[in-house]
Amino acid sequence: MLSNTKRTEIKKSQKKAVFETTKLYQIIDESLIAHIAINQDDQPFVIPMLVWRVDNNIYVHGAKNSRLMRALKQGQSCCLTFTLFDGWVLARSAFHHSAHYRSAMVFGQFETIESNAQKNQLLNHFIEQIAPGRSELVRQGDEKELTATELLTMPLTEASVKISNNGVGDEAKDKDIPVWAGVLPYRTIVGPLIDDVEHDRSIPQPDYSSVYGERWYIPK
């Protein structure tokens, strides 16, 4: 269960708060991109980054000389947000139009992964989450590449989750208005694969559908 701290307490629309750790994991794993907020020289920055999870830790990587990596490596406290948009809620009044979404907010400090061997292992884990079996086929990062890459980790010890999925919430006075009401779903579809222009046609396309479930593209 997620702990309720001063920073993670949900004050607006508390009924949308969710405390199951599994929901937090699902949002992180599906969204892939986090917006990371930092403060540098009294100037706020919000930077979108690829983020992946292994057990109860998240990981982010980038060039060592980047603004974000330098700030996070110094142990600066930061906030990350993950958001999945699931659809529009079309009500009978303009005021009650809203959205279905799943969101998570994570607080903490990142720590540096120093070992190149550990970097390689964790980066391969990320590849396997995207394309199972691929890390065994591609060239592994060499010492120069791994040394130039900053890899940081943060435990998921302070986080909140908010989910909106309750459909239309019209007032009684509006329910007789003769207009369609309901949900316009949004869904991210993964695939089909697009070959590189220099792809050797004798190499068959792989099947990565196992990690995407119902989001995998199925031709009609």
Give the ranges of each region predicted by the language model:
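C-terminal edge-of-domain segments
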Residues: M1-R7, K119-K220
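An N-terminal domain-cap segment
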Residues: N4-Y59, R70
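Catalytic micro-motifs at enzyme active sites that drive phosphoryl/nucleotidyl and oxygen chemistry
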Residues: I38-D41, L68, A91-F95, R139-G141
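Short, structured beta-strand-loop surface elements
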Residues: N65-H125
